[in-house]
């Protein structure tokens, strides 16, 4: 029942996908004292089950993705129990399922490379997130706070989707408080 409601609220009359947030739109309409009035959602029954030793890590923003992963990583203090080669140049550098030729330094905090090919011809600074980059020999220099996502389009083409590390990924494009690549768009 709840999933069907979520699907209806996320889809427009013509089937287009609407911006409907699971936490701020859906979640706040649940419970005995909801902060959002929506009669249909308010009528749902909700149960909260506490988990023994449960913890919550928020992955809603670029910064939270890194800070939450650092918090999980730092649950293990015995370095012998961590499976990696050498010592990380900074605890907030994360590389997974990737090939890279980058020599990281302590001046490279908040780096995330996932499902990507990042050769030594790339220069990273800090607060850079790189995802989906195919094998390449490009010479690229990312300024602080610039992130890159690459998605396949068809069989042989790629779409580059740059964004800012602190971009909220929401907001009216005419509003000066809405940012893209760390700058106001309105």
Predicted regions and their residues:
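Left-handed beta-helix
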Residues: 1-186
